[in-house]
């Protein structure tokens, strides 16, 4: 099967042998020679010389026809080309098929056609003569009489090949390919109306029906067609033809693309970007007869003679709202959304300020303020009083009806008409950290309190192990802090508070039980999941409430040589750290059992000044918060019944999670922690994540 049979074009056999025969070469040379005149024969021979620089050069075609491509001869932009006409092959003259690039291998053949600029004259001539255009740019009906005499024209099915229907030449029609000589402004581009649809007046003198009622949108099958039979049949014509550049008003000739595939891809990206604010053209766009991107008509009366009005402004990328952005409408101007949004879709007042605080590309801002700049009673705005644009008055709120019975809404609430948004959380301002921190943190007092607590709770053997671990990093602490003055220590505390400010959002967003403590082991931040798991309240951990915990993970009977934690008087917020006047937070050693505390400080000694990005993953036992009353309940028989029920039914919700380790007061967990350092390379805080082992 040869190439002619594949393309479906009837070509006489033997015309394209693939070799440059003498007839083709002679014909090619004769086409390059000027028409002979009555001048001297020497001048004719001089003009026939191919190496003569004065010989006129023919402009190379953008794409050769199939016959010229096979013969490797120069072709022209017209179809049929002169060579095919001379050889009587004008009916079979069509564009040749180029070899696809690798990145276009999956692209359809129709999308790789040359850009519109190469066939602009052909489109103009065809539309003026009301001749349909086939997909490859050739006329489906040959208007040349001599061509039809040589070869009979084959009938063409208009349903299959008429991809660009020609608008009817009536008063209300619009030719998208009008030339500037017809009274059109040279800066006016295509109308938003796609030439795929016929803009013609009906026979009874009424305007073409774009919508059945004011509040009812027509389906895409009835869009912009005055023909009753076509409007009733949703499949009468192709609504979306990817090869039609006017469907989305893409000016392919100005994009400098060699094929439609890349130009349409680039244009579609721009179309998607400009459609970020929704399909809501204004009244001026309705007077021009624009249609929405969804294909549904939004206005009932198109204006006749598009592009001929002296007040008509050019459309940027076929979007009238882009022009109104550059035109700068007055402040407080409302956008009439036409039939796209029903009159009863007005948002409540609290929704206006909670709308997205950003400009879409096509929503023309009246000023540089946010569309939702109206103050909300739920959001304190005291922290933003110094803004440079706060003196600009917000757009007036209007609930009045426009003359056509449709409600006006502002551009900030067009995107989500039925969205329910709760009151916003106030944005925290980190500037208060730098203003509130005036004194350095007393780490020396914190280490002294930690040492006293360890001596009271642990046995001498375990106390020695913890002391050795802390003593191994003591020289490093002295070396890094001996050159720091008071201002450096204040700056260190500001860095800690600023980092903790960031971790608070992380803790609230993460569902894992998390705590953050200082290098002394004092708790600085805690998540609610940790409180659910262990029973320790946040205020108790931060030292804001009295600590009544009596659970130390061991026996209440005092051991020999040391004092048990059970005999230690619980301390509260009234017991303040000496010299600082601040409440004492809970230490990390109070949350772990004895073995876990010893193991933690031995790992901390290796990681504090070691690997700055290292972490430790191991298992531990968390101590639940228990008062004396809780300890008595834990020893009762009712708790044994609860543990049996827990083993049978499993853990469900917060109640089941809170009951983990209720009997013995310990929760077996796997935890991961890391050390974060400050700008002086000193351990600043410890971040720990826990997961219970079920």
Curated annotation (Swiss-Prot):
What's a single GO BP term from this record? gluconeogenesis
**UniProt region (Disordered), positions on chain:** 1-61, 126-240, 276-300, 552-582
Write down the DNA-binding region ranges. Answer: 65-93
Q: Which UniProt keywords apply?
A: Activator, DNA-binding, Gluconeogenesis, Metal-binding, Nucleus, Transcription, Transcription regulation, Zinc
The residue ranges flagged as biased composition, category Low complexity, are: 142-171
Q: Could you tell me one molecular function GO term of this UniProt entry?
A: zinc ion binding
List, alphabetically, the Gene3D superfamilies matched.
Answer: Zn(2)-C6 fungal-type DNA-binding domain
Q: Name one GO cellular component term.
A: nucleus
> Where along the chain is composition biased (Basic and acidic residues)?
17-55
As for what it does, the entry says: Transcription factor which regulates nonfermentable carbon utilization. Activator of gluconeogenetic genes.
Give the record's family classification.
Belongs to the ERT1/acuK family.
What InterPro entries does its record include? ERT1_acuK_gluconeogen_tf, PAS_13, Zn2-C6_fun-type_DNA-bd_sf, Zn2Cys6_DnaBD
Compartment(s) of residence: Nucleus
Domain of life of the organism in this record? Answer: Eukaryota
The species is Penicillium rubens (strain ATCC 28089 / DSM 1075 / NRRL 1951 / Wisconsin 54-1255) (Penicillium chrysogenum)
**Principal place of residence:** nucleus
Q: State the protein's name.
A: Transcription activator of gluconeogenesis Pc22g08580
Q: Where is the composition biased (Polar residues)?
A: 132-141, 172-234, 281-300, 552-581
């Amino acid at each position: 099967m040869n190439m002619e049979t594949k393309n479906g074009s009837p070509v006489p056999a033997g015309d394209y042998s693939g070799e440059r025969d003498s007839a083709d070469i002679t014909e090619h040379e004769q086409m390059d020679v000027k028409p002979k005149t009555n001048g001297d024969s020497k001048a004719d021979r001089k003009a026939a010389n191919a190496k003569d620089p004065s010989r006129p050069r023919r402009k190379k075609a953008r794409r050769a026809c199939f016959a010229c491509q096979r013969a490797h001869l120069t072709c022209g932009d017209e179809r049929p080309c002169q060579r095919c006409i001379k050889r009587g092959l004008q009916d079979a003259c069509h564009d040749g098929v180029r070899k696809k690039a690798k990145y276009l291998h999956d692209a359809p053949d129709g999308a790789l056609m040359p850009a519109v600029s190469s066939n602009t004259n052909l489109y103009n001539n065809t539309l003026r003569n009301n001749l349909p255009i086939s997909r490859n740019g050739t006329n489906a009906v040959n208007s040349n009489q001599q061509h039809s005499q040589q070869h009979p024209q084959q009938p063409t099915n208009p349903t299959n090949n008429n991809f660009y229907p020609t608008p009817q030449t009536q008063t209300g029609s619009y030719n998208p390919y009008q030339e500037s000589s017809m009274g059109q402004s040279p800066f006016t581009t295509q109308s938003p109306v796609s030439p795929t649809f016929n803009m013609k007046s009906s026979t009874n003198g009424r305007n073409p029906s774009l919508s059945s009622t004011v509040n009812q949108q027509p389906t895409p099958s009835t869009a912009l067609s005055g023909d009753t039979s076509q409007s009733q049949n949703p499949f009468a014509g192709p609504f979306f033809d990817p090869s039609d550049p006017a469907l989305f008003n893409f000016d392919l000739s100005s994009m400098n693309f060699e094929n439609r595939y890349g130009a349409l891809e680039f244009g579609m990206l721009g179309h998607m970007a400009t459609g970020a604010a929704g399909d809501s053209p204004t009244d001026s766009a309705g007077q021009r007869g624009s249609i929405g991107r969804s294909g549904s008509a939004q206005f009932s009366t198109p204006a006749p003679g598009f592009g001929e009005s002296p007040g008509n402004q050019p459309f940027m990328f076929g979007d009238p709202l882009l022009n109104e952005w550059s035109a700068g409408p007055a402040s407080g101007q409302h956008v009439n959304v036409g039939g796209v949004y029903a009159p009863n879709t007005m948002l409540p007042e609290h929704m206006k300020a909670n709308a997205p605080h950003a400009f879409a590309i096509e929503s023309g801002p009246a000023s540089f303020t946010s569309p939702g700049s109206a103050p909300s009673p739920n959001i304190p705005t005291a922290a933003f009083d110094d803004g440079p644009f706060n003196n600009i008055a917000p757009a007036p709120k209007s609930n009045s009806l426009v003359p056509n019975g449709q409600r006006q809404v502002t551009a900030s609430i067009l995107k989500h008409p039925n969205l329910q948004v709760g009151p916003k959380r106030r944005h925290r301002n980190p500037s208060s950290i730098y203003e509130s921190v005036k004194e350095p943190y007393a780490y020396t007092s914190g280490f002294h309190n930690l040492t006293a607590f360890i001596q009271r709770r642990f046995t001498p053997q375990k106390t020695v192990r913890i002391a050795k671990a802390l003593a191994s990093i003591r020289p490093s602490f002295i070396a890094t802090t001996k050159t720091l003055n008071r201002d450096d220590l204040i700056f260190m505390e500001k860095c800690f508070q600023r980092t903790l400010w960031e971790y608070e959002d992380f803790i609230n967003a993460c569902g894992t039980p998390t705590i953050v403590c200082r290098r002394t082991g004092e708790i600085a931040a805690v998540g609610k999941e940790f409180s659910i798991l262990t029973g320790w309240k946040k205020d108790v951990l931060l030292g804001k409430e009295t600590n009544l915990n009596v659970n130390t993970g061991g026996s209440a009977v005092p051991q020999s040589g040391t004092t048990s934690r059970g005999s230690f008087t619980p301390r509260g917020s009234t017991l303040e750290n000496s010299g600082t006047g601040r409440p004492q937070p809970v230490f990390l050693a109070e949350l772990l059992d004895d073995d876990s505390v010893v193991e933690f400080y031995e790992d901390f000694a290796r990681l504090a000044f070691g690997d700055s990005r290292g972490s430790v993953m191991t298992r531990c036992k968390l101590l639940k918060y228990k008062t004396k009353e809780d300890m008595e309940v834990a020893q009762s028989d009712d708790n044994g019944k609860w543990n049996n029920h827990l083993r049978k039914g499993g853990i469900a919700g917060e109640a089941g999670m809170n009951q983990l380790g209720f009997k013995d007061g310990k929760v077996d967990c796997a935890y991961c922690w890391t050390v974060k350092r400050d700008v002086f390379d000193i351990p600043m805080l410890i971040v720990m994540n826990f997961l219970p082992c079920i």
